[in-house]
A protein has these predicted regions:
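Sec-dependent signal peptide recognition
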Residues: 2-9, 14
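Boundary at the C-terminal end of the N-terminal hydrophobic targeting segment
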Residues: 16-20, 26-28
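Short, Gly/Pro- and small/polar-rich lid/capping loops
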Residues: 28-43
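Intrinsically disordered, low-complexity linker/terminal regions across diverse proteins
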Residues: 31-33, 232, 238, 266-271, ...
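Active-site-surrounding "flap" and adjacent substrate/cofactor-binding loops of secreted or lumenal enzymes
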Residues: 33-36, 49-54, 58-128
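Hydrophobic/aromatic-rich, well-ordered segments within soluble, folded domains that form packed cores
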Residues: 45-65, 194-216, 588, 596-600
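Short, solvent-exposed loop/turn elements at domain surfaces
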Residues: 63-67, 189-190, 500
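Noncatalytic, helix-rich "gating/capping" subdomain that lines the substrate-entry/channel surface
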Residues: 95-391
Length: 692
């Protein structure tokens, strides 16, 4: 007992020290215009490096030397990070103007949302009071029979404290329909590996310290807070053990189990899902997709075996952590101490104006970006992107016609699917209507909760209705692109259609190396190990023959071996982490898409130049068009990252920049020819891998 008390005392001393993490004054930094991002930056090239030995160092070396990771970022890239910085500033200009002098009801709505977030004096004045009703409702819970009612009430108010994930999604076997889906969830950390892996042992210790501090801020006594924190970690660890791992969960076919509601309730009879579904206004449905049945069996055992006090601690924790950034500075600092410093490796939090810009975009994305898109993405840019995508699709079609591992039946099905892909470029045809969302300039927590209720209501309203094929899954300020297998669509938000990815004023080589490779990457997802399970209508129906499926796996095994043998990061004794190798299987889909996207984009460039009477051997600024293509591709992935790459391969199938560049060009012979490499050099190996 004395040893236990000593351990608690030492931990709480650490907690006290952790409640004022350094650097939080950065919240008050004011916006400054970020520098413009060049489409191709020849000054970034490290000419002391050999392109045939380490192309990433050659293309990015000087940029890496001159662009350290900012203290409020976990990593910094020449493309995604720099462009996100620019877009945030442009969005801030819209929000700042709307907050001070709105010119329309829509501008007043998002201007008030932003202003409420920025008013930290009022946040301090209100303290924890906005959460008191929810915390009291949890405190009044007397037994496990009331869990369904409580989590439903919390969800209906905008909180997210469920131990699972409930949503309305497309029916995997009939993509024209939308059905209820329920699956694993309930964890605070980014991935189940954080709870189970030895690599994250120290992170878990810090997690307990963080939760203890948060509970103490909310009024718990020290030992009580520590015990509550341990109980939450144990609970979430049990949920993690019951959850599918990162590789399995990406296999869509394994997570489709249509079940009637009564049979689903039998999986977890101790949690009244009927009360929950009614409480969140889910509407009437007789069947649902139970994606992870075993998870709910385990959840039921936990409900029966854990005391009601443990569940109350779990629910209180999820209410606190979900709203931490809307609470007084002590909570924000503590939230940053763990999720920012420990998990994301940031030294300082984002300035408040950035946090509020991101929060407003998340809540009112279509409202905020309507005016922004008009000023930053012209109709002519959209037309240029339309033409580029059409050229890429033709190149992919030509490749499908000649792939040696693909038989006639599979080839025909692949061409049919390609012809049915829909491209959404820039912005939606119809903007989301936020008229039903009430925004109060003096109620930050209320705005956040009402926004969550609005989003949940919009999602639940889809049940039983035809799918809106023109709906976007992300806001237009998102610097990313994605392929949706259920929609069979490739989507390019306006935010990514800017330099360095896309510039209608620069030579085609750089555009094809930038956005062209990204688009080719997304297109090949329609035909990878998961894309092959969905037909052109988005239905879960395999269109590869059994023999061709076997040949496809044989082709990809080469990439599994190629990437899987490489060291991602050396061990770090100071941070509880051994050497990490790349996981060739976990990253296979993304690696295959990188390789396919590069090849398709290059062929599309070659054909585009030929149609203009030009050649890939023509020179601009001392580099041939094909060299500029590969440089444009590589410089998209120029990045600096501190420590995180060591654990990144465990949780992220997207590899770090050096491998996305070097691992890809090694497999494309045209690269070796472009830079006059000798066969056998690292970037021009004697043997290589090819799927597409």
């Amino acid at each position: 007992m004395n040893l236990f008390r000593t351990a608690v005392f030492l931990l709480l001393a650490d907690v006290a020290m952790a409640q004022a993490p350094s650097g939080t004054q950065a919240e008050g930094q004011q916006p400054t215009p970020p520098p413009a991002v060049k489409s191709l930056d020849l000054s970034a090239i490290d000419k002391t490096a050999d392109a045939c030995t380490d192309f990433y160092q050659y293309a990015c070396g000087n940029w890496m030397k001159n662009n350290p990771v900012p203290s409020n970022e976990r990593r910094w890239s020449r493309s995604f990070s720099a462009l996100r910085e620019r877009n945030l500033y442009l969005l801030w200009q819209e929000l700042d103007a709307a907050a001070k002098n709105p010119q329309s009801p829509l501008q007043k709505q998002y201007g008030d949302y932003y202003a409420a977030c920025l008013n930290t004096d009022l946040v301090e004045e209100k303290g924890l009071e906005p959460l008191r009703p929810a915390l009291k409702r949890i405190a009044d819970l007397h037994d496990a029979k009331g869990l369904g009612s409580v989590i439903a009430e919390l969800a209906a108010q905008g909180f997210s404290a469920e131990m699972f994930h409930f949503s309305i999604e497309q029916d995997k076997t009939d993509a024209s329909k939308q059905i209820a889906t329920i699956s694993q969830g309930g964890m605070s950390l980014p991935d189940r590996g954080y709870y189970l892996g030895e690599h994250f042992r120290y992170t878990r210790t810090q997690f307990i310290r963080h939760m203890t501090a948060m509970f103490m801020l909310a009024g718990d006594k020290d030992a009580e807070a520590f015990n509550d924190a341990r109980a939450v970690l144990n609970m979430e660890t049990s949920l993690a053990l019951a959850s599918a791992n990162g590789i399995d969960v990406r296999d869509t076919g394994k997570y489709y189990h249509i079940t009637n509601v009564a049979d689903f309730q039998k999986l977890a009879p101790d949690l009244d899902f009927g009360v929950y579904f009614k409480g969140v206004n889910a509407g009437r449905f007789d069947t649902l997709n139970v994606a992870t049945p075993d998870f709910f069996r385990t959840l039921n055992r936990l409900i029966g075996s854990q005391s009601i006090d443990v569940w109350k601690s779990y629910l209180r924790w999820h209410v606190l952590t979900a709203l931490a950034q809307d609470l007084p500075k002590a909570y924000r600092d503590q939230d940053f101490f763990f999720f920012g410093q420990r998990v994301a490796k940031q030294k300082e939090p984002l300035p408040r104006w950035k946090q509020c810009t991101e929060m407003t975009d998340a809540a009112l994305g279509d409202a905020v970006t309507q005016d922004w898109v008009k000023r930053n993405f012209s109709p002519s840019s959209k037309a240029s992107m339309d033409r580029l995508i059409a050229t890429l699709e033709k190149s992919l079609s030509d490749e499908i016609k000649t792939l040696p591992w693909m038989g006639a039946d599979t080839r025909k099905a692949a061409e049919e699917k390609l012809s049915m892909i829909r491209n959404q470029i820039g912005y939606p045809e119809k903007w989301r209507d936020y008229a039903a969302l009430n925004v109060d300039r003096e109620d930050l927590v209320g705005n956040t909760l009402r926004s969550a209720v609005f989003r949940r209501g919009s999602m639940l309203s889809k049940l039983g209705k035809p799918v809106d094929e023109k709906e976007w899954e992300v806001t237009l300020a998102t610097v990313n692109a994605y392929y949706s297998p259920s929609m069979n669509s490739v989507n390019f938000p306006a935010a990514i259609l800017q330099p360095p990815f896309f510039d209608p004023e620069i030579d085609p080589a750089v555009n094809f190396g930038g956005i062209g490779v990204v688009a080719g990457h997304e297109l090949t997802h329609a035909f990878d190990d998961q894309g092959a399970k969905f037909d052109g209508k988005g239905n879960l129906r395999s269109w590869q023959t059994r023999d061709d499926r076997k040949k496809f796996v044989e082709q990809t095994n080469c990439e599994v071996a190629q990437y899987g043998g490489a060291v991602a990061a050396p061990g770090d004794d100071d941070d509880d982490a051994p050497q990490q190798n790349l996981n060739g299987k976990f990253a296979l889909r993304e690696n295959t898409a990188d390789n396919g996207g590069l090849r398709i984009a290059y062929l599309a460039l070659r054909d585009t130049l030929a149609a203009q009477g030009k050649s890939v051997d023509d020179k601009i600024d001392g580099y041939t068009e094909k060299q500029r293509f590969f440089l444009g591709f590589a410089q998209v992935w120029c990045e600096n990252e501190e420590k995180l790459p060591r654990k990144r391969p465990l949780i992220d199938p997207h590899l770090a920049g050096p491998w996305r560049v070097n691992g890809t060009v090694q497999n494309f012979e045209e690269f070796g020819k472009a830079f006059a490499c000798t066969k056998g050099q690292p970037m021009y190996p004697v043997s290589s891998c090819r799927v597409w």
